[in-house]
Amino acid sequence: MDTTQRLLQLTSPALPVGAYSYSEGLEWLVDQGTIDNESHLRTWLLQELAYGSIRMEAAVMVRGYRASTDVQILQYWNAWLSAARETEELRLQSLQMGRSLLRLSKALQDPEHTGPELIEVWEQLQTGCNFAIAFGLTANLWQIPLESATLGYLHSWATNLISAGIKLIPLGQTTGQQLLFQLQPHIEAATQSILLLEDKDLCSCGWGLALASMAHETQYSRLFRS
């Protein structure tokens, strides 16, 4: 079976994991006037792709994919990513989306092809699974090539934040699509870079995102979840 359709399903905005309800600090940045046009949003997204926590998340997703049904490795990277989250808001977002994706993955899995190793993974992760781990595990189960899964992970992240920017700044729909189109070579470059990262290289320079997320937790008026 061509796995392209499965990749499209896994990265679809219609995937019921609640990604649309989060802005990852963008709402506060717009409220403060730090990001108020397409150029500012493009700069923010490019900086995050180059230095931010999305690179770290995607790298952990890669490790979750490679771990397959090795519970110990999955638990290690799941705990590692939870500890690396800068704010409670970002941690709760990751855990909520991961829980939703894990539940969906179980619902779509063919019982005849569900071995004891996979059942154990679901049982061990059901109390708290980061989205990156759930995404990597699901992509592996659906036999999506790792490079495609990594590209899709970054593309869906960019799509979600551009959609948030369209609502918040606001921007036109065409402008949003132009921005996503312009980001494509940068997403491709980030994909290739992330696939080559060794464990010792995993890090992020996400203090701007961390401060925005912390402020968003107590922002008086919000469209997006905290």
Curated annotation (Swiss-Prot):
Designated gene of the protein: ureF
Alphabetical list of HAMAP family matching this protein: UreF
GO CC annotation: cytoplasm
Chaperone found in the keyword field: yes
InterPro entries documented for this protein: UreF, UreF_sf
Similarity comment: Belongs to the UreF family.
MF terms in GO: nickel cation binding
Main location (coarse class): cytoplasm
Alphabetized Gene3D superfamilies for the sequence: Urease accessory protein UreF (1.10.4190.10)
Protein task: Required for maturation of urease via the functional incorporation of the urease nickel metallocenter.
Organism of derivation: Acaryochloris marina (strain MBIC 11017)
The protein, known as: Urease accessory protein UreF
